Amino acid sequence: MLFKEIISFGIGILIIQLYFIVAKHFGIIDKPSDRSSHVVPTLRGGGILFPLIYMLVGITSVYFGYHAISLWFVLGIFLIATISFWDDVATLSPKIRVIVHVLSVAILIWQTGIYEYGFLIVLLSIILIIGSINAYNFMDGINGITALYSMVVVGSLTYKLPEMRLQYLLVAIIVFAIYNVRKKAVCFSGDVGSVSLAYIIAFCIAKLMVNTQEIKWIFLLGIYGIDSIVTILYRLKRKENIFKPHRTHLYQYLANEKGMSHVSVSLIYAVAQALLSYVVITGNFVNVLIAFGIALVIYLAVRLKLGLD
């Protein structure tokens, strides 16, 4: 079994090295700005590895008669990855992005069986999933955070949904981490990486919730959820445009204003999610709420102590 993962690792290295050649040739570079947390131009879009590897897994699985990963799901990944990569390399109309996101999420709703729960649940799910995908993208702001946090989330889902063959996605994340989890990153994930990851994760969490009839699985994204929602609330309080780029997430403040290393901050978020995920997997809903509440209190205490109000 490990042989396949080793082959996937080799394929991942090959894909990302080939992408570096393409990105350098076409100038797919993330240049520093007053809203970013990096100071040198860096290759963008290295996360293209995630959808490519997982789509390959999905297509080959179906070809060999294994249908847990449907071609419709692969299509959803393809659509959202394509529009996200387009956004990485060129100016994209927000309307086009929204249309493709809604279409991809509609496939998710259908394939996971959420559509059977009625219009209100479907509408709420679409809003929640699109919001989660965008939040996951916004949290991709420092070296290492997407790689390390996603290792925890995808690792948990690999354990709970072995039929989804997420171990190959986990391998792709590890390959990306080699080039990103460092003081000076070789590449960033880009929208194509973070958005595609978020879509796959959302699909799997939705599948778990439908299969088990338990809502607790949403807390597999609990730490990102806390930082995203609290930051939005504070920005609304300050009457800021929440759709404009900013650097007011706690992780951004720790990495920029406080001068902590990107990898250290990323590890804190990953470890915090790992602890919460352990409770999600092993405990009941009450246990999960208690653990989430503790995480929220700690987060708010740190924010207030740092004067982020």
List the model feature ranges, each with a label:
Residues 1-3, 211-309:
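C-terminal membrane-associated helical module and adjoining short loops/tails
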